[in-house]
């Protein structure tokens, strides 16, 4: 039994030995895993390195945790600081203005506001042509040299077969030798060329002659390119001087006001404002705006259509435009007359802009535009409306932020839905926010909301005209439907009492009389009661010489179903 157990144990012990043999054979056949085992085993054999690795993390752990805690605290403080620091709108605008000024300064130094001149382009094209010709000639020379070397190699191939076999065997194992192949080939070709010269000198002489015949154009063309480069480097680049509306850019506080307008037009996006400024400068140069202003040409036939008159309640100059004048065929019958009107309109705009005192921070640097749509041409005249859209777009792009408010009065019923549909296409959102539309019945109230009646021309419902009462204040009153309204003008002593009165909408009755304050005196009729129609003179001007204390009583009878607005002023002298 003991012998059997010994034999079994021996068999068991022998079993793993038998299994190890095929494994070792496999390991020997595959070289890569054996190398990995040897590389891994190298650090494991050093027993001294193990305790060092185990000790160092334990010592460095608290320091790392401390650094992490410090970094977290710093991040928390930064976050708190970011939450606390909030830039106001003025600070954001100042920062954007400084960035914009830097970009404008760089553009002036690089002369980016001037368009490239055509002669310079021609010179560049000539230089390019010469360079291309030289490149083509070099290519032809290289091709000829390649053909000559190929011929030499074909003739001498049987002489050196062993060298090529050695090259192919040496280039396979190492990648770096593949890069050195062209050098080796060059050496071989030179050796072959020397042998070829000994064998056949005639072919070499022919090749040299062909090469020499091509070389002279290189020496002739090369100095031309060098001369052009030297001329380009010799030209000094000076900063460009650009001015808009008579104000040079980046000179004083006036330019800050102008640059701020371009920033506001592009919502303080600096790069977009710079492109807008460049486009405006280019547009002014192409259309010769400065020369147009200096010419001083005035066309009286357009003055009835567009004119500047008075100021609004905030001090902005008001510019009135009458779209009904576009129906005049004598003025707007063809494109030439339309373009003539556009140039005159630009000239008027330039004069109004140049009259602004940009150095005064309290001065208003924008305008109020009042556009009268009474008797305006219908949508059937597409060419005319396309011209109007183009003109509006030009003013919006090249005169940014010069409109404080735009009032459209006497707007017909068809224009309101048209504007709601196509308004987003015609104008920008910023411009639409400044627009106010009013129909015929609400036009006067809309104007008087922004402009005082004494500043509004008589044509548009005001009392602004050259009279002795111009400096007097105007009083407004409302006459209710189917009611009378009386106005009393006192006279404390003997004097001459003058007054001006206007009823918006007409269709009322007007009368005036003098009533003395002393007993026993009789009333005196100054103006008999009469009806005022829409065709009558809109402004009633009257006066009375008072001989004793009393008052002038004016009676207005409104028998219509609509309320009426009355404007009047008076003066004693």
UniProtKB/Swiss-Prot annotation:
The keyword Membrane applies. Residues 471-572 form the GOLD domain. Expressed ubiquitously with higher levels in expanding roots and leaves (at protein level). GO terms for biological process: cell division; pollen tube growth. Pfam families: CRAL_TRIO, CRAL_TRIO_N, GOLD_PATL1_C. One of its GO terms (cellular component) is Golgi apparatus. It is found in: Membrane; Cytoplasm. The modification N-acetylalanine is found at residue 2. Residues 295-468 form the CRAL-TRIO domain. Residues 89-157 form a coiled coil. Residues 1-74, 111-202 are annotated as: Disordered. Keywords: Acetylation, Cell cycle, Cell division, Coiled coil, Cytoplasm, Isopeptide bond, Lipid-binding, Membrane, Phosphoprotein, Transport, Ubl conjugation. There is a cross-link at residue 285 (Glycyl lysine isopeptide (Lys-Gly) (interchain with G-Cter in ubiquitin)). The keyword Acetylation applies. InterPro entries: CRAL-TRIO_dom, CRAL-TRIO_dom_sf, CRAL/TRIO_N_dom, CRAL/TRIO_N_dom_sf, GOLD_dom, GOLD_dom_sf, PATL, PATL1-6_C_GOLD. Transmembrane segments: none annotated. The modification Phosphothreonine is found at residues 29, 118. Its main location: membrane. 'Patella' means 'small plate' in Latin. Belongs to the patellin family. This is Patellin-1. It comes from Arabidopsis thaliana.
């Amino acid at each position: 039994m003991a012998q059997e157990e010994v034999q079994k144990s021996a068999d068991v012990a022998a079993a793993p030995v038998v299994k190890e043999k095929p494994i070792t054979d496999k390991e020997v056949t595959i070289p890569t895993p054996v190398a990995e085992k040897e590389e891994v085993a190298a650090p494991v054999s050093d027993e001294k390195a193990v305790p060092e690795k185990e000790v160092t993390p334990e010592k460095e752990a608290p320091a790392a945790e401390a650094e992490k805690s410090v970094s977290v605290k710093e991040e928390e403080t930064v976050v708190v600081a970011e939450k606390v620091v909030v830039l106001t709108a003025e600070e954001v605008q100042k920062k954007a203005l400084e960035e914009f000024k830097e970009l404008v300064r760089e553009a002036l130094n690089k002369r980016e506001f001037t368009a490239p001149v055509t002669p310079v382009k021609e010179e560049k094209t000539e230089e390019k042509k010469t360079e291309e010709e030289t490149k083509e000639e070099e290519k032809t020379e290289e091709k000829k040299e390649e053909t000559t070397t190929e011929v030499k190699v074909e003739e001498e191939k049987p002489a050196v077969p062993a060298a090529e076999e050695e090259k192919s065997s040496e280039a396979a194992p190492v990648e770096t030798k593949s890069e050195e192949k062209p050098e080796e080939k060059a050496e071989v070709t030179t050796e072959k060329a020397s042998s070829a010269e000994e064998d056949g000198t005639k072919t070499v002489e022919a090749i040299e002659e062909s090469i020499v015949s091509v070389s002279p154009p290189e020496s002739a063309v090369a100095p031309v390119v060098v001369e052009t480069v030297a001329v380009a480097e010799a030209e000094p680049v000076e900063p460009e001087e650009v001015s808009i509306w008579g104000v040079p850019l980046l000179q004083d506080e006036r330019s800050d006001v102008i640059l701020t307008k371009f920033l506001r037009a592009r919502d303080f996006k600096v790069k977009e404002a710079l492109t807008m400024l460049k486009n405006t400068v280019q547009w002014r140069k192409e259309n010769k705006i400065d020369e147009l202003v200096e010419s001083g040409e005035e066309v009286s036939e357009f003055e009835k259509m567009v004119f500047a008159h008075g100021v609004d309640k905030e001090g902005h100059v008001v510019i009135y435009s009458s779209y009904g004048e576009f129906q005049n065929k004598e003025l707007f019958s063809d494109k030439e007359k339309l373009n003539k009107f556009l140039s005159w309109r630009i000239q008027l705009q330039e004069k109004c802009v140049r009259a602004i005192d940009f150095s005064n921070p309290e001065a208003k640097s924008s305008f109020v535009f009042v556009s009268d749509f009474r008797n305006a041409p219908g949508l059937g005249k597409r060419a005319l409306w396309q011209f109007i859209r183009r003109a509006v777009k030009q003013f919006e792009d090249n005169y940014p932020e010069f409109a404080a408010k735009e009032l459209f009065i006497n707007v017909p019923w068809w224009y309101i839905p048209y504007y709601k549909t196509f308004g987003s296409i015609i104008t920008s959102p910023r411009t639409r926010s400044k627009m106010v539309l009013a129909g015929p019945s609400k036009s006067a109230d809309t104007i008087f909301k922004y402009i005082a009646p004494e500043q509004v021309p008589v044509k548009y419902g005001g009392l602004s005209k050259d009279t002795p009462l111009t400096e007097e204040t105007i009083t407004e009153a409302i006459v209710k439907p189917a009611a009378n309204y009386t106005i009393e003008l006192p006279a404390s002593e003997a004097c001459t009492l003058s007054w001006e009165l206007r009823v918006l909408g007409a269709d009322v009755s007007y009368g005036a009389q003098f009533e003395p304050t002393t007993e026993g005196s009789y009333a005196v009729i100054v103006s008999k009661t009469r009806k005022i129609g829409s065709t009558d003179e809109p402004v009633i001007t009257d006066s009375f010489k008072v001989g004793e204390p009393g008052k002038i009583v004016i009676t207005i009878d409104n028998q219509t179903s609509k309320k009426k607005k009355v404007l009047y002023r008076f003066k004693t002298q």
